[in-house]
């Protein structure tokens, strides 16, 4: 697994669920400029690594019910985010919000779970009519839109509630758009 920082100058490589190596793209052939070693949870494998859009944080997702938030360039563990379900041992996506203030994760219970990145405290659970495990969560980096998916796609926008403004929108889990306050 690998991820570029928002500037596109540094990339992180997660190796064998044990270490993260940071490389500078201008001199990656010289090897990593920093390596961090971790153990997350026994029985969990890492499934993803991501930088926050402000470049200050990284997250490690797992096939367990744990997301780890790290300081991006010192490698210091900040928070372990838990409280969501992954009782199937599958890859569940988590994403930073565009302002880097929150992490949102899917869950095998069909819900989305939200945590603050400054405290690690869970601040909300969103129910969006997903009938299967929510395995993907992504944010539009410029507009206030979040997408979540199981076998169907839900689009979330600020404003609260399910809307059926013209043109009519169907709600999830049928193909369509779900609007919910984020």
Q: Predicted regions span which residues?
A:
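Terminal intrinsically disordered, low-complexity extensions flanking WD-repeat/beta-propeller proteins
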Residues: 91-92, 121-182
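Residue-level detector of Asp-centered blade-edge/turn motifs that repeat once per structural unit
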Residues: 6-7, 53-54, 98-99, 141-142
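Per-blade loop-tip surfaces of WD-repeat and WD-like beta-propellers in eukaryotic adaptors/scaffolds
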Residues: 7, 16-40, 69-79, 114-124, ...
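C-terminal transmembrane module of eukaryotic multi-pass membrane proteins
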Residues: 104-111, 117, 135
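Canonical WD40 repeat/beta-propeller blade segments in eukaryotic WD-repeat proteins
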Residues: 1-4, 42-50, 88-95, 132-138
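Conserved strand-to-loop turn within each blade of WD40 beta-propeller repeats
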Residues: 14-17, 61-64, 106-109, 149-151
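A surface-exposed beta-alpha-beta supersecondary segment
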Residues: 79-103
């Amino acid at each position: 697994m690998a991820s570029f920082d928002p500037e596109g100058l540094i990339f992180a490589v997660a190796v064998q669920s044990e270490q993260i190596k940071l490389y500078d793209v201008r001199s990656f052939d010289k090897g990593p400029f920093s390596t961090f070693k971790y153990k997350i949870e026994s029985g969990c494998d890492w499934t993803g690594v991501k930088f926050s859009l402000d470049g200050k944080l990284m997250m490690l997702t797992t096939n367990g019910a744990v997301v780890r938030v790290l300081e991006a360039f010192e490698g210091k563990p900040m928070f372990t985010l838990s409280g969501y379900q992954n009782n199937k041992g599958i890859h569940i996506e988590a994403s930073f919000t565009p302002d880097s203030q929150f992490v949102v994760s899917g869950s095998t219970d069909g819900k989305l779970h939200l945590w603050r990145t400054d405290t690690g405290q869970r601040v909300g659970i969103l129910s969006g009519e997903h009938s299967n495990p929510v395995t993907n969560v992504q944010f539009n980096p410029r507009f206030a839109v979040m997408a979540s998916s199981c076998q169907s796609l839900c689009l979330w926008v600020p404003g609260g509630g399910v809307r059926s403004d013209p043109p009519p929108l169907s709600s999830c889990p049928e193909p369509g758009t779900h609007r919910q306050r984020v």
